[in-house]
Amino acid sequence: MGDKKRVLVIFGGQSSEHEVSRISATSILKNINLDKFDVSMIGITKDGKWLYYDGPIDKIPSGEWEEIALKDGTRSIADRVSLFDNIISCKNNACGLEKASENEKSKKIDVVFPVLHGCNGEDGTIQGLFELAGIPYVGCGVLASAVGMDKIYAKIIFEKAGIPQADYLYFTRKEIYGDVEGVVDKIEEKFSYPVFVKPSNAGSSVGVSKAHDKNELKEALIYAARYDRKVLIEEFINGREVECAVLGNDDPVASTVGEIIPGNEFYDYKAKYIENTSKIKIPADLPEETVEQIRNYAVKAFKALDCSGLARVDFFVHKETGKVYINEINTMPGFTSISMYPMLWEESGISYPELIEKLIDLAVQRYNDNLKEYDE
């Protein structure tokens, strides 16, 4: 067997999905094939410090990893890790991972797996850093990550691509805080209750509310504006919530379709990660033509945003008409034990370790495809 690929797994981050990231990363670290990959880990604390971690994997979900990382040696958090000087070299193609000590040599890496959800993780920011440094990385590029994270602009792209979706409006935080009554009036002119209110840039249903009347709508608008400066309002679709996984670069393929059966009124953050009351059905009990339509729309959305590597695309299937509506796309879906993305591929014939290997290979493939040759 040849040399192992050196993979850097990054977890944590400063978003509201920090805890989900830690759980996703732990799941990946437990399933990655160590016969093929040499794995290093970096955790990003909630206050944005990057820490090299080589301790037990099972200390990551609880957050204990941070204390262990800080106790490693006598270095303080200030000199333990420095992003630009000591962790990732921004000299193009340097691909360097260094520990903050004069006595330790740089550890080279081949691929980064950024298991980061939410802002500053899957919104194109960290992807831009990897592009600048010339390091292959798992997942979508800067453009697809940024657009996929912004629900409003993703909807604009889906509309242009001809993919059916719920009707919508959007407002800025300034508009909401400045005249919430006026914003409510505009929403009521267009939609009847209930409506969904969402921060434009947030994942895992963070900041999302279902408003049934004027008072709930006001509260929902102010609540969503806490999480982002843009707020999306969508008409209510009385639909079943289904999801489809996509894998690939230029020739992506779609998985089977799974259904979320929410334990709450809708599949919010609590239902996903805290109460564990929702149920998952894979494959979804849907007519074959509906499944194929969902799979086709998933690939169409993936291509419309110029995604690469992976994405999970969420849909509604109207309970009465059977019409399919795209809800949103997630360019770094969860990898927890209850996450749809790996489960959908497992049902489709790709095991978790195989899936991780394919994602790493796709990252290298895209990196090589993007290399530009210039005439001297």
Curated annotation (Swiss-Prot):
Residues binding ATP, per UniProt: 188-243
Pfam assignment, any one: Dala_Dala_lig_C
Highest taxon above the source species: Bacteria
Keywords: ATP-binding, Cell shape, Cell wall biogenesis/degradation, Cytoplasm, Ligase, Magnesium, Manganese, Metal-binding, Nucleotide-binding, Peptidoglycan synthesis
Cofactor: Mg(2+); Mn(2+)
Recorded GO CC terms: cytosol
Pathway info: Cell wall biogenesis; peptidoglycan biosynthesis
EC numbers for this chain: 6.3.2.4
EC category: ligase
UniProt binding sites for Mg(2+) 2: E328, N330
Biological processes per GO annotation: cell wall organization; peptidoglycan biosynthetic process; regulation of cell shape
Localization in the cell: Cytoplasm
Record note on cofactor: Binds 2 magnesium or manganese ions per subunit.
Domain called ATP-grasp: residue spans: 155-361
Catalytic activity: 2 D-alanine + ATP = D-alanyl-D-alanine + ADP + phosphate + H(+)
Binding site for Mg(2+) 1: D314, E328
Single GO term (MF): D-alanine-D-alanine ligase activity
Family, per entry: Belongs to the D-alanine--D-alanine ligase family.
Primary role: Cell wall formation.
Protein name: D-alanine--D-alanine ligase
Organism field: Acetivibrio thermocellus (strain ATCC 27405 / DSM 1237 / JCM 9322 / NBRC 103400 / NCIMB 10682 / NRRL B-4536 / VPI 7372) (Clostridium thermocellum)
Biological classification of the source: Bacteria, Bacillati, Bacillota, Clostridia, Eubacteriales
